[in-house]
Amino acid sequence: MDLYEYQARDLFEAHGVPVLAGIVAQTPDEAKAAAEKIGGVTVVKAQVKVGGRGKAGGVKVAKTADEAYEHAKAILGMDIKGHTVHQVMIAQGADIAEEYYFSVLLDRANRTYLAMCSVEGGMEIEQLAEERPEALAKVPVSALTGIDAETAQKIVAEAGFPEELRADVAEVIQKLWEVFEKEDATLVEVNPLVKTGDGKILALDGKVSLDDNAEFRQEGHAALVDERTEDPLEAKAKANDLNYVKLDGQVGVIGNGAGLVMSTLDVVAYAGEKHGGVKPANFLDIGGGANAEVMANGLDVILGDEQVKSVFVNVFGGITACDAVANGIVKALEILGDAATKPLVVRLDGNAVEEGRRILQEANHPLVTLAATMDEGADKAAELAHTAN
């Protein structure tokens, strides 16, 4: 889960990372009141989970509370790269002397963590990495020790901080690691990390991504979800403990096991090239418990996507036998009733496959077509989706 800037700021503050005052506002009046409370120069910042706010006009400096009101009025409701601005953060103005960059993230390729740091912050890090890679220090971080004092000193030294700043910057970096570790984050980024005119080191703009798989031990994270920006289908799937990701195609996909589902997406995409370019509409892994309720919930999510024209159910029976899956499909269609209106292509293989096929054949549901192989099923589902278009 990606956080808004104000949420990242609040997490930073909770872990002792030095930040400036910031108050979230959802109306121009709230923005004015926040600016009056903070006092002095403030910055009105659109709260969206996408970059490029400044270029889009979503970040404005306000010298007075009245200016903050006018800026908030202009920014609220703005569309920034497809994201509607529902709230702004009124941030205390900073006397910036220098801008730096710091982030810590998962390094999946090397199965560790990676800290990245530069004395050249404030710009897009991708641009810096491409144009001047030598200006971006990359330091592996051990999962056993994390960013301790020694590692923090190594980071600031490799980044090229002057000797007189290293202790202060290293201290902030250790606190940012605490955010990363204690909050089960997959990314903590500060751009810019700044030195103010009086020599203080502050985290001015933060980005945090949290690991959804750690929600069971992070009770406070549920309150950070903004339901206004959640995809309703993904929210419904999550509520039913389904692993679902919406894509932009026309063939709904249900499978058991992430590996099988990903393979199914590839096969559907390949088959779609022969049928008008149709593509997979989603990733949906029902796991090992493909009973009637789970199957009904899965179908309910997929059939709620208006883009879906057909559904391909691809199941390999293992612990959950194919006859149980078949019974689940039949009962799921009974549960959904008139809500089930799109054709289903079902491919079963593995444990109790013959019994599973027999159950579906005897049910003789008009929406269900049996396929002997994954390739055959993907081709038929793609054909049906193309025909429906």
UniProtKB/Swiss-Prot annotation:
Binds 1 Mg(2+) ion per subunit. The keyword Ligase applies. It catalyses: succinate + ATP + CoA = succinyl-CoA + ADP + phosphate; GTP + succinate + CoA = succinyl-CoA + GDP + phosphate. It comes from the Bacteria. GO terms for biological process: succinyl-CoA metabolic process; tricarboxylic acid cycle. Its cofactor is Mg(2+). Disulfide bonds: none annotated. Residues 9-236 form the ATP-grasp domain. Keywords: ATP-binding, Ligase, Magnesium, Metal-binding, Nucleotide-binding, Tricarboxylic acid cycle. Its EC number is 6.2.1.5. Mg(2+) binds at N191, D205. Belongs to the succinate/malate CoA ligase beta subunit family. This is Succinate--CoA ligase [ADP-forming] subunit beta. The gene is sucC.
